[in-house]
Amino acid sequence: MSDARTRKIEARLKEIVGDEVASLSDPRLKGLVTVTGVRVSPNLSHATVFYSLLAGGDPEEAREGLQSAAGRIQAAVGAQTRLKRTPRLRFEPDPTVERVTRIQRTLREVSGEDGDGNGTQE
């Protein structure tokens, strides 16, 4: 399958899954859950959905909540796409968000910021 087609499918899945996640009312998803990306396997049988969690939610609880809704979300993907086979969904926290946080923390430490964001030296 071409890279362009794969990217197009991933973008469409991100849109569908994001809409479905936004409509969930699971208490385990207390923080704002944002779908940040989707990666499909070469044969489209599996899709890893990456998400970030804002507003202090528990990442493991969020994963459990998303996994419990995977069937409903997968059904929506099947109904809204013309794929021969609907990919099996797996939810993973987006590692990029944690990396960015670590980098920002390191930069603040190196630059001597006092943590209030105004860049003053201690």
UniProtKB/Swiss-Prot annotation:
BP-aspect Gene Ontology terms: maturation of SSU-rRNA
Localization, per the record, is: Cytoplasm
Q: Which InterPro entries match?
A: KH_dom-like_a/b, RbfA, RbfA_dom_sf, Ribosome-bd_factorA_CS
Where is the region Disordered? Answer: 95-122
Give the record's subunit note.
Monomer. Binds 30S ribosomal subunits, but not 50S ribosomal subunits or 70S ribosomes.
**Family membership noted in the UniProt record:** Belongs to the RbfA family.
> What name goes with this protein?
Ribosome-binding factor A
Organism of this sequence: Rubrobacter xylanophilus (strain DSM 9941 / JCM 11954 / NBRC 16129 / PRD-1)
